Amino acid sequence: MSTHGPNTLFAPVNILSRAEAQDIAQRALKNSPAEETRVSISSTARADTRFALNQVTTSGENRDTNVTITAFVGNRSASVSTNRLDDASLAAAAKQATEIAKLVPPNPERMPELSQQTYPAARDRVISLPTPAERAAAAKLVTELARANELIATGFIECRASASALANSKGLFAFDSSANVTMTATVRSPDGTGSGWACSDGTTFADIDAKQVAATAVEKAKTSRSPVAIEPGRYVTILEPTAVGNLVQLVVGAMQARAADEGRSFFSKQGGGNKLGMKVVDDRVTLITDPEDAPSTTGGFDGSGLPLEKVTWIENGVVKTLNYDRFWAQKQNVQPTRVGGGFGARSLRMVGGTTSVPDMIKETERGVLVTRFWYIRAVDPRTILYTGLTRDGTFLIENGKVTHPIKNFRFNESPIFFLNNLQAMGPTVRINASENLGAGGAVYMPPIKVRDFTFSSLSDAV
């Protein structure tokens, strides 16, 4: 009988090592009565600090390990999760998953489990969490600068170290680890009319530039007070990197081969087939994901155990890859696309240019500067059309200068449209483009300047 016990939120343990994960997986597989079994393991250590009204309000840490056992009975499957790691609990979860699998409808698209795969060598990663005092010191840089400027700061620091493993009854075992840190700050004016925001994202706490977060958020809060209303319409628009990431990652999310082949997406070709090899955006646009990028947050394998590889989605405006899952790849007689994440956008990189945001502004006769978007919702998948709102600093540009803060807009726009209207790009930087801004949402995006960006209506939201 194993001596492994449950990991609680308060257990003083680190994330699992490869050997520990392999031991758990082997014990879970040994006790499974299913025809085929897959074991997914997630081990996470998390630390966070929240601040509001210019003071730290919460600080916490937790550790947990979760094991999901998927049992396959013919073409039927079911999953059960547990964070109890003893033999009896793992066996009970496997048995329960098997019994449930017998009751669910068969899945005609079910693919057999993979045998052992060859994975790239695991990268050396710094897996550590900052202390509460270190996190509080970073928060203090924001709150003190806000207080000195008679502003109100709110923000969140999240640090996460994690290990993931996948094993199955055909002998496959995969393991990887990662670390992600993000710090965000929103600074408001006391009258509620001004709002500034900034974020710093990295793989270790040393990557976080709290001083820059403080300076940017405070400056935007000061300069965005008392915004004026301008007419909705199509404007030359400069999108800062976070705003670019908010929308450009949706392009890769839409690059599903099956939807394209079945005529349900922008990447469907008129008359049948898909747009592989066709030019769809400006020549300067190249989008890639590469799990071997040094700062990549992507693990080395997908949810079925396939090793991930570098994928060029769009190169010089031309569609190079669509996302084929294993079933659709087999049906179409092609290789599956080896990319992780639900949207295939983790560690997405857009190749940038050389024009800085100040230079873009200098070269703009009349336009709009956008910090970021939120409340982004799909409108039409066939054009990748989305709607959402600007927030935390939207400004009018006139004759090469930022002249006024303006009220927020609702936009109705497709990233495909504005990537065809590209005028300039700046250097690519790491940003967090997740709408919930949790650690692990890193993508690499440049600021861009586009023409005819569609703002459909005004918003009273700050």
Residue ranges of model-derived segments:
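Dual-mode signal for accessory low-complexity, basic/Gly-rich regions
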Residues: P6, T118-Y119, Q270-V462
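Active-site bordering "gate/hinge" segments
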Residues: M1-G299, L306-K310, E315-V318, K401, ...
